[in-house]
Regions:
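Ubiquitin-like/PB1-type beta-grasp interaction modules and other compact soluble beta-rich domains
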Residues: 1-90
């Protein structure tokens, strides 16, 4: 079994306020593991995931700022930066 890669999660908007920090390093192989680690490390973000493990509609995830992701099975690589944003409607 290989070690989990270290991934940096950057928080923006409401997630930053709820996390109480700008970023967090987590060990995760998939987006699902990453979300679980974020909820564990940042109690203010409890409820980030739906009962089926997917991200709630209140948040968006972007890997390396290039693509938005929703598949919790998607793998992450060592050194990836994953952005967690509010999915607020703008005006």
């Amino acid at each position: 079994m290989s070690a989990r890669p270290v991934v940096t999660v950057e928080f923006y908007g409401v997630p930053r306020q709820r996390a109480g920090r700008a970023e967090l390093e987590v060990a995760a192989r998939t987006i699902g593991e990453l979300l679980e680690a974020v909820e564990h490390a940042c109690p203010g973000l409890a409820g980030l995931r739906r009962p089926d493990g997917r991200l709630t509609a209140h948040y968006l995830l972007s890997v390396e700022g290039r693509q938005f992701v929703s598949d919790v099975r998607q793998e992450v690589r060592p050194g990836d930066r994953v952005l967690l944003l509010s999915a607020d409607a703008g005006g």
